[in-house]
């Protein structure tokens, strides 16, 4: 077996849809095509939105499709726990490393303040934090804490972080201009995705991260966190988003071709084969198992632009 360790990191807030399945398929194929293994981590930081029964269903669905992980989830393994809701003490340890470096500060801004007209926006519509609370005095912090419980942000430098994505190619962002100081912890104490995912992938030995292109812009800040925390960073492969026939992004909330509905109409091999066809991995939507696709898998066959599902494919 090679040293490649891929991973699934789904958020179990509902049944998986075709976009989630596509990401799992490519992550599995990318790892297995080089003789590697796959770890399943359940990203249930917000345990209220992510009940355990959805995580159990997710595991069963992956097994039904032939995409069962080698480690993690309810199967366990040497680097657990594999549920983020059970890893708060681990996140606290690494959060405190950033605190000791003087990089963490309280933020009292409301949502309306963050979306004020004078706040800079990225091209994707996300607000770049203006640093309103970055230089508060100790006295100001005491006064504001009496009125409002703060969230916690990390100070980023005016530095450009660049990397070469395994699929999308070169990408760079200036942290101060394109990202801004980002959240590490919510006011209710829940740790933010950006910190948790970095700590988890490093401690679980993940060497290859396959995820949607919508997370490409998160990578520079995560690479910076890896560096600040002294953790090894994986290679990144960002895949195109799978879109509905009308060009709309697939959503669990909208029930877009959830696996629950697909299971009533198709065999596992039919679902895998049609997804592989949509991703350019085969020339026709013929039924296939993941194992049958692994030997011929190549990222060069996967498009870089968003994939619109052909009408009538599902």
Predicted regions and their residues:
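Noncatalytic linker/hinge segments flanking ATPase motor cores
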Residues: 17, 81-89, 146-148, 194-199, ...
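Charged/polar, solvent-exposed surface patches and flexible loops
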Residues: 60, 93, 116, 131, ...
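Non-catalytic terminal extensions that flank enzyme cores
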Residues: 1-15, 33, 38, 65, ...
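N-terminal Rossmann-like or analogous alpha/beta NTP/dinucleotide-binding catalytic cores
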Residues: 1-122, 213-214, 218-231, 288
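Active-site cores that bind ATP or allylic diphosphates and position pyrophosphate for catalysis
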Residues: 112-251, 258-262, 311-314
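Short secondary-structure transition/capping segments
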Residues: 82-97, 121-128, 148-158, 278-293
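Alpha-helix initiation and N-capping motif
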Residues: 55, 88, 111-114, 126, ...
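Short, mixed-charge aromatic SLiMs
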Residues: 46-56, 244-246, 295-303
